[in-house]
Amino acid sequence: MAGTTPPDNPYIAARNEWNERYGSYVKAAAAWRIVGITGMTMAVIGFGYALYQSTQVKLIPYIVEVDKLGTAVNAGFPQQIEYADPRVVRATLGSFVSNFRSVTPDAVVQKQYIDRTYGLLRTSDPATEKVNAWFRSNSPFEKAKTATVAIEVNNIVALSNQSYQVDWTEFERDRRGKETATRRFRGIATVTLTPPQDEGVIRLNPIGLYLRDFDWTAQL
């Protein structure tokens, strides 16, 4: 008796035909989805890294020294220069003393003096603690209620590459402008150069000169 072939299942036949026609498209679509997800992930990682790098930008000043005719004779980044031009150091120290010791009735200007003073100080150095102690017991805002103090820097002498002697005179006047006292002081400042790391620091301390230590005494 001859064998009989069972009739084809129409559902199986339809599925096979669908697989043959569209299965490759489904696989290709799945592959492209994987590629798309991978690309998006890499884009997110790249954007995150770029954003992180943007927050790490450091502004480093480039110092150029010129002679009397304006010709450049030395240049470089602060970390490449062992010590700044002594004239620049002396001018910076003179400004520091004036900002530190001046007393004015204008509270806005007084705050600027204090900001400029701390622009040359670092929290870890002894000079900062000494200046803090002075301001704690000698508030310039309280002093300004009854008097003003003007500073005249008389002399700044280099004792070494890192230490300077500063002599100055303080003229105290009452609020009517009458001079009530004149005092002379001498300070010894030990300085160091550290490259500024952001724009805010550069505005207050463009060459990165910091006072590591600072002592001062009244002179007879």
From Swiss-Prot:
User: Entry's Pfam families?
Assistant: VirB8
Q: How does it sit in the membrane?
A: Single-pass membrane protein
Which pairs of positions does the record mark as disulfide bonds? none
The regions listed as transmembrane in this protein's record are: 28-52
Q: Which UniProt keywords apply?
A: Cell membrane, Conjugation, Membrane, Plasmid, Transmembrane, Transmembrane helix
Q: Which domain of life is it from?
A: Bacteria
Question: Quick one: where is this thing mainly located?
Answer: membrane
- GO CC terms: plasma membrane
Report the locations given in the UniProt record: Cell membrane
| InterPro entries named among the record's database cross-references | NTF2-like_dom_sf, TrbF, VirB8
Q: Which family does it belong to?
A: Belongs to the TrbF family.
Recorded protein name is Conjugal transfer protein TrbF
Q: Which organism is it from?
A: Rhizobium radiobacter
